[in-house]
Amino acid sequence: MMREIAASNYPVIVYESKHRAVRFLEELAAAAQEKGREVVVSVARELTKLHESFYQGSPEAVLKEVQGDVNNLKGEFVILIRPKKKVQTS
């Protein structure tokens, strides 16, 4: 499934529990690297609650931020994965 998500040309939204979110990001980073795809990940954690957090960047960067957050294992995660847009230069 991760390979399909990493290779998708469309945004994918995933809802993950606190127990699976870190592993999901690790597997996504590996799949994107394997496919040679650049993806952007946006993570929203604990929406509308006290410890609400947002992260955005490459899977590796977001994973590092989530792992460094002392509240990272609280609540649910909404993860949006989309292909990185290539900027055309003229």
Feature locations, PLM:
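A contiguous loop/helix-start segment that scaffolds small-molecule binding in enzyme catalytic cores
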Residues: 10-90
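Class I SAM-dependent methyltransferase SAM-binding "motif I" and its flanking Rossmann-like core
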Residues: 1-8
